[in-house]
Amino acid sequence: MTRFRPCIDLHAGQVKQIVGGTLDSATSELRTNFVSPHPPAYFAKLYRDNDLSGAHVIMLGPGNKEAALESLKAWPGGLQVGGGITDANAREWVEAGAEKVIITSYLFPNGKFSQSHLDAVLAALDGDKSKLVIDLSCRRQGDDRWFVAMNKWQTITDMEVSEESIKALEPYCSEFLIHAADNEGLQKGIDEKLVQRLSEWCSIPVTYAGGGRNLEDLETVKRLSGGKVDLTIGSALDCFGGKGVTLQECVEWNRRQ
C-alpha cells in the first residue's frame, strides 16, 4: 500500500530542501527552499518516534559524512543512506547503522551503465541485495521518456528508465528510489505519467520523489499506482518550512492505510 516516506537531504553538512534541477557545485546557482536550524539527528529522531520507516538520507556533495553518521546514530537500522556510495564504502555505511545503502552515480562511470560496478557493490554487501537500493533518479527527455541523471542530476546517462532497465536491475536490489529531478523542490505537482509507469514496471518496492505537495498527491499516487508506489514529500512539509502539509498529517495518513 502507498506510504508517505520522509527524507533528510544534506548539503554542506546542513539539512536543506533544494530545487533539484539547480543542484551543481556552484553554490550561486543553487536554489534553496529551506535550510533547517535543526541538526540531522533531530529529523532522524522525529521519523523514528513516528514510525516513518524507509526514510532516505541523501548526501548532496562533499562535507556531509559526519551529518549522515549523526542521523544513523539517532536511529540505527532505520534509515537508508545515499550520495557517494561505492563498493569501497557500502559495507562501512551498513556497519555504521544504515538499514540500506542507495547507489546512483557509481553505477554510471562517464555516464554509461556499468554492470561490473553493480556487481562490485553487491559483493561488498556479501551479496545481500536486501541492503541495496538503486536510485534511478531521472530527467524527462521528450514525451514520456525518462533517462537516469547522475552527478547531482546534472549529467544525463545512457540508461532510459523503462520496463527493460527496471527488469534488468531488479535481481540486484530490494527497492528503487526515483527522484523526478525536473519536479524536485518545485512543489508544482508530481510527474503522474512516471508514477503510473513505475507501478506497471516494478515488482519490488519503489519510492517516487519530486513535486509532492499535500495529501491529495499521496491519494493521487495511491490511485495511479494501485498502492504500489510510495511518495516522498520534502519542501512542502511544515518541518521543512513548507505550507502544503504537516508531518503529522502524513503520519496519520500512513496509519489509515
UniProtKB/Swiss-Prot annotation:
Its EC number is 5.3.1.16. Keywords: Amino-acid biosynthesis, Cytoplasm, Histidine biosynthesis, Isomerase. It is an enzyme of class 5 (isomerase). It comes from the Eukaryota. InterPro entries: Aldolase_TIM (IPR013785), His6-like_euk (IPR011858), His_biosynth (IPR006062), Isoase_HisA-like (IPR044524), RibuloseP-bd_barrel (IPR011060). It catalyses: 1-(5-phospho-beta-D-ribosyl)-5-[(5-phospho-beta-D-ribosylamino)methylideneamino]imidazole-4-carboxamide = 5-[(5-phospho-1-deoxy-D-ribulos-1-ylimino)methylamino]-1-(5-phospho-beta-D-ribosyl)imidazole-4-carboxamide. One of its GO terms (biological process) is L-histidine biosynthetic process. GO terms for molecular function: 1-(5-phosphoribosyl)-5-[(5-phosphoribosylamino)methylideneamino]imidazole-4-carboxamide isomerase activity. Belongs to the HisA/HisF family. GO terms for cellular component: cytoplasm. It is found in: Cytoplasm. The lineage of its organism: Eukaryota, Fungi, Dikarya, Ascomycota, Pezizomycotina. Pathway: Amino-acid biosynthesis; L-histidine biosynthesis; L-histidine from 5-phospho-alpha-D-ribose 1-diphosphate: step 4/9. Its main location: cytoplasm. This is 1-(5-phosphoribosyl)-5-[(5-phosphoribosylamino)methylideneamino] imidazole-4-carboxamide isomerase. SUPFAM superfamilies: Ribulose-phoshate binding barrel.
